[in-house]
Protein backbone atom coordinates (compact mmCIF):
# COMPACT_ATOMS: atom_id res chain seq x y z
CA UNK A 1 0.00 0.00 0.00
CA UNK A 2 3.02 2.30 0.34
CA UNK A 3 2.88 5.20 -2.10
CA UNK A 4 6.52 5.27 -3.21
CA UNK A 5 6.52 8.86 -4.43
CA UNK A 6 4.95 10.04 -1.20
CA UNK A 7 7.35 7.87 0.84
CA UNK A 8 10.36 9.42 -0.90
CA UNK A 9 9.13 12.97 -0.22
CA UNK A 10 8.33 12.18 3.42
CA UNK A 11 11.81 10.72 3.92
CA UNK A 12 13.33 13.85 2.35
CA UNK A 13 11.38 16.09 4.74
CA UNK A 14 12.50 14.11 7.79
CA UNK A 15 16.16 14.07 6.73
CA UNK A 16 16.18 17.76 5.80
CA UNK A 17 14.74 18.80 9.16
CA UNK A 18 16.95 16.48 11.20
CA UNK A 19 20.01 18.02 9.53
CA UNK A 20 18.66 21.58 9.93
CA UNK A 21 17.94 21.24 13.66
CA UNK A 22 20.88 19.04 14.70
CA UNK A 23 23.34 21.89 15.33
CA UNK A 24 21.04 23.47 17.92
CA UNK A 25 19.74 20.16 19.29
CA UNK A 26 22.61 17.89 20.38
CA UNK A 27 20.35 15.08 21.64
CA UNK A 28 18.18 15.00 18.50
CA UNK A 29 18.93 11.91 16.44
CA UNK A 30 15.63 10.59 15.01
CA UNK A 31 12.17 11.43 13.72
CA UNK A 32 9.18 9.39 12.54
CA UNK A 33 6.14 9.87 10.30
CA UNK A 34 3.24 7.51 9.61
CA UNK A 35 0.55 8.42 7.06
CA UNK A 36 -2.54 6.26 6.63
CA UNK A 37 -5.86 6.17 4.88
CA UNK A 38 -8.06 6.28 7.99
CA UNK A 39 -10.99 4.69 6.18
CA UNK A 40 -9.32 1.38 5.32
CA UNK A 41 -6.11 1.22 7.37
CA UNK A 42 -3.76 1.27 4.39
CA UNK A 43 -0.36 2.72 5.24
CA UNK A 44 0.56 5.31 2.63
CA UNK A 45 3.94 6.16 4.14
CA UNK A 46 5.91 4.87 7.11
CA UNK A 47 9.20 6.70 7.41
CA UNK A 48 11.85 7.11 10.06
CA UNK A 49 15.38 8.45 9.95
CA UNK A 50 18.27 8.36 12.39
CA UNK A 51 21.35 10.56 12.51
CA UNK A 52 24.61 8.67 12.93
CA UNK A 53 27.91 10.50 13.34
CA UNK A 54 30.75 8.64 11.62
CA UNK A 55 34.26 10.06 11.73
CA UNK A 56 32.91 13.51 12.52
CA UNK A 57 30.47 13.45 9.61
CA UNK A 58 26.71 13.31 9.94
CA UNK A 59 25.06 10.46 8.09
CA UNK A 60 21.36 9.66 8.04
CA UNK A 61 20.22 6.04 8.19
CA UNK A 62 16.81 4.49 7.67
CA UNK A 63 14.76 3.83 10.80
CA UNK A 64 11.32 3.21 9.29
CA UNK A 65 10.72 0.13 11.43
CA UNK A 66 11.30 2.30 14.50
CA UNK A 67 7.69 3.40 14.00
CA UNK A 68 6.67 0.04 15.45
CA UNK A 69 9.78 -1.11 17.37
CA UNK A 70 10.48 1.98 19.53
CA UNK A 71 8.17 3.82 21.94
CA UNK A 72 8.06 7.22 23.62
CA UNK A 73 5.96 9.41 25.90
CA UNK A 74 3.82 11.17 23.31
CA UNK A 75 2.48 14.08 25.32
CA UNK A 76 -0.60 16.17 24.63
CA UNK A 77 -1.37 14.50 21.30
CA UNK A 78 -3.31 11.87 23.30
CA UNK A 79 -5.57 14.37 25.09
CA UNK A 80 -8.44 13.45 22.76
CA UNK A 81 -8.44 9.98 24.33
CA UNK A 82 -8.45 11.50 27.83
CA UNK A 83 -11.54 13.62 27.13
CA UNK A 84 -13.36 10.76 25.39
CA UNK A 85 -12.66 8.57 28.42
CA UNK A 86 -14.08 11.34 30.60
CA UNK A 87 -17.26 11.59 28.52
CA UNK A 88 -17.86 7.85 28.35
CA UNK A 89 -17.36 7.27 32.07
CA UNK A 90 -19.72 10.15 32.84
CA UNK A 91 -16.91 11.92 34.71
CA UNK A 92 -17.32 14.99 32.49
CA UNK A 93 -19.77 16.13 29.83
CA UNK A 94 -19.30 18.13 26.62
CA UNK A 95 -19.21 21.81 27.53
CA UNK A 96 -18.15 21.31 31.16
CA UNK A 97 -15.91 24.09 32.43
CA UNK A 98 -12.92 23.96 34.76
CA UNK A 99 -10.81 26.82 36.03
CA UNK A 100 -7.29 26.46 34.65
CA UNK A 101 -4.82 27.62 37.30
CA UNK A 102 -1.88 25.82 38.93
CA UNK A 103 -3.02 22.90 41.10
CA UNK A 104 -1.25 22.29 44.40
CA UNK A 105 -1.20 18.93 46.14
CA UNK A 106 0.32 18.01 49.48
CA UNK A 107 4.03 17.25 49.23
CA UNK A 108 4.45 17.81 45.49
CA UNK A 109 5.27 20.62 43.11
CA UNK A 110 2.36 22.47 41.52
CA UNK A 111 0.80 20.74 38.50
CA UNK A 112 0.04 23.29 35.81
CA UNK A 113 -0.51 24.06 32.15
CA UNK A 114 2.31 25.31 29.93
CA UNK A 115 0.90 28.82 30.32
CA UNK A 116 2.01 28.88 33.95
CA UNK A 117 -0.50 31.50 35.11
CA UNK A 118 -3.29 29.39 33.63
CA UNK A 119 -6.06 29.92 31.07
CA UNK A 120 -8.89 30.80 33.46
CA UNK A 121 -12.36 29.31 32.98
CA UNK A 122 -12.34 27.02 29.93
CA UNK A 123 -14.48 24.30 28.39
CA UNK A 124 -13.40 21.09 26.67
CA UNK A 125 -12.99 22.59 23.18
CA UNK A 126 -10.89 25.44 24.52
CA UNK A 127 -8.86 22.91 26.54
CA UNK A 128 -7.89 21.11 23.34
CA UNK A 129 -7.33 24.35 21.42
CA UNK A 130 -4.74 25.70 23.85
CA UNK A 131 -3.65 22.27 25.17
CA UNK A 132 -4.64 22.77 28.80
CA UNK A 133 -3.02 20.30 31.18
CA UNK A 134 -5.18 21.37 34.10
CA UNK A 135 -8.40 20.46 32.27
CA UNK A 136 -6.98 16.95 31.71
CA UNK A 137 -5.89 16.71 35.36
CA UNK A 138 -9.40 17.64 36.49
CA UNK A 139 -10.86 15.08 34.07
CA UNK A 140 -8.55 12.36 35.42
CA UNK A 141 -9.53 13.23 39.00
CA UNK A 142 -13.23 13.01 38.09
CA UNK A 143 -12.63 9.61 36.44
CA UNK A 144 -10.97 8.54 39.70
CA UNK A 145 -13.92 9.88 41.71
CA UNK A 146 -11.75 12.45 43.48
CA UNK A 147 -12.50 16.15 44.01
CA UNK A 148 -9.58 18.57 43.90
CA UNK A 149 -8.82 20.19 47.25
CA UNK A 150 -5.97 22.76 47.15
CA UNK A 151 -3.00 21.51 49.22
CA UNK A 152 -4.92 18.32 49.96
CA UNK A 153 -3.56 14.81 49.55
CA UNK A 154 -4.44 12.64 46.57
CA UNK A 155 -6.08 9.27 47.04
CA UNK A 156 -6.32 7.59 43.65
CA UNK A 157 -6.93 3.85 43.42
CA UNK A 158 -5.41 1.51 40.83
CA UNK A 159 -8.86 1.14 39.27
CA UNK A 160 -8.62 4.64 37.80
CA UNK A 161 -5.53 3.61 35.83
CA UNK A 162 -7.30 0.46 34.68
CA UNK A 163 -10.28 2.50 33.48
CA UNK A 164 -8.19 4.99 31.52
CA UNK A 165 -6.03 2.27 29.97
CA UNK A 166 -9.15 0.30 29.03
CA UNK A 167 -10.38 3.20 26.91
CA UNK A 168 -6.94 4.18 25.57
CA UNK A 169 -6.46 0.61 24.33
CA UNK A 170 -9.61 0.92 22.21
CA UNK A 171 -7.72 3.48 20.10
CA UNK A 172 -4.66 1.22 19.84
CA UNK A 173 -2.67 2.96 22.58
CA UNK A 174 -0.93 0.23 24.57
CA UNK A 175 -1.97 -2.79 22.47
CA UNK A 176 -0.69 -4.32 19.21
CA UNK A 177 -1.92 -2.36 16.19
CA UNK A 178 -2.26 -5.58 14.18
CA UNK A 179 0.09 -4.46 11.40
CA UNK A 180 1.10 -7.20 8.95
CA UNK A 181 4.80 -7.02 9.93
CA UNK A 182 6.76 -8.86 12.66
CA UNK A 183 8.47 -7.49 15.80
CA UNK A 184 5.93 -4.83 16.74
CA UNK A 185 6.13 -3.67 20.37
CA UNK A 186 3.24 -2.26 22.40
CA UNK A 187 5.16 0.34 24.39
CA UNK A 188 5.66 0.43 28.14
CA UNK A 189 2.76 0.21 30.56
CA UNK A 190 4.36 1.43 33.75
CA UNK A 191 3.76 -0.55 36.90
CA UNK A 192 4.60 2.01 39.61
CA UNK A 193 1.05 3.28 39.88
CA UNK A 194 1.16 3.58 43.67
CA UNK A 195 1.88 7.30 43.45
CA UNK A 196 -1.49 8.86 42.66
CA UNK A 197 0.00 11.86 40.84
CA UNK A 198 1.00 9.54 38.01
CA UNK A 199 -2.63 9.34 36.86
CA UNK A 200 -2.41 13.07 36.13
CA UNK A 201 0.78 12.47 34.12
CA UNK A 202 -0.97 9.65 32.25
CA UNK A 203 -3.81 12.00 31.27
CA UNK A 204 -1.41 14.29 29.38
CA UNK A 205 0.66 11.54 27.73
CA UNK A 206 3.62 11.66 30.12
CA UNK A 207 3.49 8.22 31.72
CA UNK A 208 2.95 5.17 29.49
CA UNK A 209 4.90 5.05 26.22
CA UNK A 210 3.48 4.35 22.76
CA UNK A 211 4.89 3.81 19.28
CA UNK A 212 4.49 6.30 16.41
CA UNK A 213 2.36 3.64 14.66
CA UNK A 214 0.03 3.36 17.67
CA UNK A 215 -0.29 7.16 17.60
CA UNK A 216 -1.28 7.00 13.92
CA UNK A 217 -3.89 4.32 14.67
CA UNK A 218 -5.33 6.47 17.47
CA UNK A 219 -5.77 9.55 15.27
CA UNK A 220 -7.12 7.45 12.38
CA UNK A 221 -9.74 5.99 14.73
CA UNK A 222 -10.95 9.46 15.67
CA UNK A 223 -10.74 10.69 12.05
CA UNK A 224 -13.01 7.93 10.70
CA UNK A 225 -15.60 8.25 13.45
CA UNK A 226 -14.53 5.50 15.82
CA UNK A 227 -13.34 2.42 13.90
CA UNK A 228 -9.90 1.02 14.77
CA UNK A 229 -8.60 -0.29 11.45
CA UNK A 230 -5.80 -2.82 11.10
CA UNK A 231 -2.80 -1.04 9.51
CA UNK A 232 -1.97 -2.74 6.21
CA UNK A 233 1.22 -2.63 4.18
CA UNK A 234 0.12 -5.38 1.77
CA UNK A 235 -2.89 -4.72 -0.46
CA UNK A 236 -2.78 -7.81 -2.67
CA UNK A 237 -0.73 -10.93 -3.33
CA UNK A 238 -0.01 -11.85 -6.95
CA UNK A 239 1.27 -14.93 -8.75
CA UNK A 240 4.92 -14.93 -9.65
CA UNK A 241 5.27 -13.97 -13.29
CA UNK A 242 8.04 -15.21 -15.60
CA UNK A 243 7.55 -12.40 -18.06
CA UNK A 244 7.58 -8.71 -17.29
CA UNK A 245 3.83 -8.33 -16.93
CA UNK A 246 2.33 -8.32 -13.46
CA UNK A 247 1.11 -11.70 -12.22
CA UNK A 248 -2.57 -12.25 -11.57
CA UNK A 249 -3.99 -11.51 -8.13
CA UNK A 250 -4.11 -14.58 -5.89
CA UNK A 251 -5.53 -12.77 -2.88
CA UNK A 252 -6.75 -9.25 -2.17
CA UNK A 253 -6.32 -8.06 1.39
CA UNK A 254 -9.59 -6.58 2.61
CA UNK A 255 -9.76 -3.82 5.24
CA UNK A 256 -10.14 -5.18 8.77
CA UNK A 257 -12.04 -3.40 11.55
CA UNK A 258 -10.36 -4.46 14.81
CA UNK A 259 -12.96 -2.78 17.01
CA UNK A 260 -15.46 0.04 17.18
CA UNK A 261 -14.56 2.28 20.11
CA UNK A 262 -17.11 2.19 22.90
CA UNK A 263 -17.96 5.87 22.55
CA UNK A 264 -20.89 7.91 21.28
CA UNK A 265 -20.67 9.48 17.83
CA UNK A 266 -21.53 12.92 19.21
CA UNK A 267 -18.62 12.63 21.65
CA UNK A 268 -16.19 11.70 18.87
CA UNK A 269 -17.53 14.61 16.81
CA UNK A 270 -16.97 16.91 19.78
CA UNK A 271 -13.28 15.94 19.90
CA UNK A 272 -13.01 16.40 16.13
CA UNK A 273 -14.37 19.93 16.52
CA UNK A 274 -11.75 20.56 19.22
CA UNK A 275 -9.05 19.28 16.89
CA UNK A 276 -10.35 21.65 14.20
CA UNK A 277 -9.99 24.52 16.67
CA UNK A 278 -6.36 23.49 17.34
CA UNK A 279 -5.39 23.96 13.68
CA UNK A 280 -7.92 26.54 12.47
CA UNK A 281 -9.18 28.87 15.21
CA UNK A 282 -7.72 31.79 17.16
CA UNK A 283 -4.70 30.92 19.28
CA UNK A 284 -4.86 27.17 18.66
CA UNK A 285 -1.46 25.53 19.12
CA UNK A 286 -1.36 24.43 15.46
CA UNK A 287 -2.78 27.60 13.85
CA UNK A 288 0.62 29.09 12.97
CA UNK A 289 1.38 26.22 10.60
CA UNK A 290 -2.00 24.93 9.42
CA UNK A 291 -4.65 27.68 9.41
CA UNK A 292 -4.30 28.66 5.75
CA UNK A 293 -3.80 25.16 4.33
CA UNK A 294 -6.35 24.68 1.51
CA UNK A 295 -6.95 21.04 2.45
CA UNK A 296 -8.53 22.02 5.81
CA UNK A 297 -6.60 19.92 8.33
CA UNK A 298 -7.43 19.25 11.98
CA UNK A 299 -5.25 17.74 14.67
CA UNK A 300 -3.40 18.04 17.93
CA UNK A 301 0.10 19.11 18.89
CA UNK A 302 2.01 17.30 21.60
CA UNK A 303 4.87 18.00 23.98
CA UNK A 304 6.09 15.55 26.61
CA UNK A 305 8.62 16.35 29.32
CA UNK A 306 10.88 13.34 29.54
CA UNK A 307 14.47 12.21 29.94
CA UNK A 308 16.88 11.25 27.19
CA UNK A 309 16.40 7.63 26.15
CA UNK A 310 19.24 7.16 23.68
CA UNK A 311 22.74 5.69 23.97
CA UNK A 312 24.89 8.77 23.36
CA UNK A 313 26.97 9.79 26.42
CA UNK A 314 26.12 13.41 25.57
CA UNK A 315 22.65 12.68 26.94
CA UNK A 316 23.93 12.22 30.50
CA UNK A 317 25.18 14.78 33.00
CA UNK A 318 28.37 14.61 35.08
CA UNK A 319 26.67 12.28 37.57
CA UNK A 320 25.65 9.91 34.78
CA UNK A 321 21.97 10.85 35.06
CA UNK A 322 19.88 11.08 31.91
CA UNK A 323 19.24 14.67 30.88
CA UNK A 324 15.77 16.17 30.83
CA UNK A 325 14.37 16.96 27.40
CA UNK A 326 11.13 17.04 25.39
CA UNK A 327 9.43 14.81 22.86
CA UNK A 328 7.53 16.80 20.22
CA UNK A 329 4.61 15.07 18.51
CA UNK A 330 1.76 15.87 16.16
CA UNK A 331 -1.34 14.07 14.96
CA UNK A 332 -3.85 15.15 12.37
CA UNK A 333 -6.02 14.40 9.38
CA UNK A 334 -7.46 16.20 6.37
CA UNK A 335 -9.87 17.42 5.21
CA UNK A 336 -11.47 17.75 8.64
CA UNK A 337 -15.00 17.24 7.29
CA UNK A 338 -14.18 14.13 5.21
CA UNK A 339 -10.75 12.75 6.17
CA UNK A 340 -8.82 10.85 3.50
CA UNK A 341 -5.39 10.94 5.14
CA UNK A 342 -4.30 10.79 8.79
CA UNK A 343 -0.79 11.10 10.16
CA UNK A 344 1.46 11.06 13.20
CA UNK A 345 4.82 12.78 13.69
CA UNK A 346 7.17 11.89 16.57
CA UNK A 347 10.46 13.72 17.24
CA UNK A 348 12.09 12.67 20.54
CA UNK A 349 14.70 14.30 22.79
CA UNK A 350 14.78 18.03 22.15
CA UNK A 351 15.99 20.84 24.42
CA UNK A 352 13.74 23.49 22.87
CA UNK A 353 10.08 22.56 23.22
CA UNK A 354 9.01 25.43 20.97
CA UNK A 355 11.20 24.93 17.90
CA UNK A 356 8.24 23.59 15.90
CA UNK A 357 10.04 20.72 14.15
CA UNK A 358 6.99 18.46 14.66
CA UNK A 359 4.65 20.96 12.98
CA UNK A 360 7.13 21.81 10.23
CA UNK A 361 7.43 18.14 9.25
CA UNK A 362 3.67 17.61 9.61
CA UNK A 363 2.86 20.54 7.33
CA UNK A 364 5.43 19.46 4.73
CA UNK A 365 4.16 15.88 4.50
CA UNK A 366 0.51 16.95 4.25
CA UNK A 367 1.44 19.49 1.56
CA UNK A 368 3.21 16.73 -0.38
CA UNK A 369 0.25 14.35 -0.09
CA UNK A 370 -2.18 16.89 -1.54
CA UNK A 371 0.30 18.18 -4.14
CA UNK A 372 0.76 14.63 -5.45
CA UNK A 373 -2.99 14.14 -5.47
CA UNK A 374 -3.45 17.22 -7.66
CA UNK A 375 -0.61 16.22 -9.98
CA UNK A 376 -2.17 12.79 -10.47
CA UNK A 377 -5.56 14.29 -11.21
CA UNK A 378 -3.88 16.34 -13.93
CA UNK A 379 -1.69 13.46 -15.10
CA UNK A 380 1.58 15.06 -14.01
CA UNK A 381 2.73 12.40 -11.55
CA UNK A 382 2.74 8.64 -11.63
CA UNK A 383 1.04 6.74 -8.86
CA UNK A 384 3.77 4.35 -7.80
CA UNK A 385 2.95 1.57 -5.43
CA UNK A 386 -0.49 0.08 -5.38
CA UNK A 387 -2.14 2.80 -3.32
CA UNK A 388 -3.92 5.33 -5.48
CA UNK A 389 -5.08 8.49 -3.80
CA UNK A 390 -8.72 9.19 -4.47
Predicted regions and their residues:
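Beta-lactam-recognizing serine transpeptidase/beta-lactamase-like catalytic domain environment
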Residues: 2-6, 25-74, 81-347, 388-390
Amino acid sequence: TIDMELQKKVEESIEKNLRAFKSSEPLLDRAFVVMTNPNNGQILSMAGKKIVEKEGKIEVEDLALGNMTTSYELGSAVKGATLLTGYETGAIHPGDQFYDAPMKFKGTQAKKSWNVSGFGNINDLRALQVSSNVYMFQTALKIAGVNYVPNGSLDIKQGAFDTMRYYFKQFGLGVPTGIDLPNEIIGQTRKVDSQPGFLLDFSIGQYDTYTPLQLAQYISTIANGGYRMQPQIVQEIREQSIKEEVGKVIRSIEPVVLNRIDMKKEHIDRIKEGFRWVFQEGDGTGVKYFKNAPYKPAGKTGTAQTVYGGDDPIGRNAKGERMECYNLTLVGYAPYDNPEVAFSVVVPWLHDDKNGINSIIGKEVLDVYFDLKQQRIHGEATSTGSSKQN
